Amino acid sequence: VLIFLLSVLLPKKKFIFHYKNVRWARGRNETYLCFVVKRRVGPDSMTFDFGHFRNRNNCHAEMLFLRYLGALCPGLWGYGVTGERKLSYSITWFCSWSPCADCSFRLAQFLSKTPNLRLRIFVSRLYFCDIEDSREREGLRMLKKAGVQITVMSYKDFFYCWQTFVARNQSKFKAWAELHQNSVRLARKLQRILQPCETEDLRDAFKLLGL
């Protein structure tokens, strides 16, 4: 199953439909997660793997990725040899939706136990983040505290996904109407959501300084 998921590129129409950063995303009830896994194997060389997941059998794409993490990142937890050095990985996700609250909490918990894994998440749209005190907003703040870099996708990110994950048959990526405006709007919204996190960090710093 893993080989199948890793080898299949997204159809063009499916990518455009699910990743379109429209304000009213009707009918987009699944999360698509395109990923890149990198590991440094030398001063000037890295291993590189990529693929995509989507929700399957009530399992969210984020949790599905974690389920296959051992196969995607061999040596992440070591090989059972005493005193061995665990391998470090850098993972980038490009998600059609930002993670739900439960996935965010579980991811943050997992990352706290896996310091040799670095995760960046690019999102096309924000999931259930309109309400000020929503659990989804709190989940994103928790991910940030866990060291995850969360960013709203811009034109260059959509272009990269088109080049990397889509069966495009040499066709060029064409920006849809209001791609840039929606990206800027969502980026500002995400910044406001994550702002309390930065305020708390400042408070902690002031406490350490005795101010």
What kind of feature is each model-predicted range?
Residues 1-211:
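Zinc-dependent deaminase catalytic domain
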